[in-house]
């Protein structure tokens, strides 16, 4: 929801400035990631990917943090966010590290013209040009044993793909 809002806002601002909007950012559908505290608290073997209340107590700060991640245009910007938050709020909890990792996944997918990154079970389902990206006629498989490692594995798979 919030990513879509940021995307629409960015396109509206670009339109008002007379800029052509790029194709937007990639969409993530990862069945092993909880993007809200409530979903994570309900249990299950999920990777937390959000800014927790315990790390940034004010909702305005958390909203701004999510906005800044959604608007990051490079891996350097993501690293700058990580450093700024570490300086201001202390060591990043795993949920924030994972949220930054999801932002990096979106950037890498967008850079490689992959509008959709989806994981169902062990299958990594990437779309490019309206078709699924298959390796040897099959979807790539994730092998990492835990959800946090699976996020890193998705990013590694994308980094190995050629840009088109």
What are these regions (language model features)?
Residues 1-164:
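Accessory helical-bundle/CTD segments and flexible terminal tails appended to RecA-like ATPase motors
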């Amino acid at each position: 929801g919030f990513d879509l809002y940021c995307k629409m806002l960015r396109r509206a601002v670009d339109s008002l400035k007379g800029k052509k909007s790029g194709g937007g950012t990639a969409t993530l559908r990862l069945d092993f990631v909880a993007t809200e505290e409530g979903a994570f608290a309900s249990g299950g073997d999920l990777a937390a990917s959000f800014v927790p209340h315990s790390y940034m107590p004010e909702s305005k700060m958390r909203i701004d943090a999510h906005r800044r991640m959604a608007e990051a245009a490079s891996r350097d910007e993501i690293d700058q966010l990580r450093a700024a938050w570490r300086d201001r709020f202390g060591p990043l909890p795993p949920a924030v590290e994972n949220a930054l990792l999801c932002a990096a996944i979106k950037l890498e997918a967008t850079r490689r013209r992959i509008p959709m990154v989806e994981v169902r079970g062990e299958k990594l389902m990437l779309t490019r040009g309206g078709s699924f990206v298959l390796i040897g006629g099959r979807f790539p498989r994730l092998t990492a044993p835990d959800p946090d490692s699976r996020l890193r594995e998705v990013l590694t798979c994308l980094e190995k793909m050629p840009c088109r």
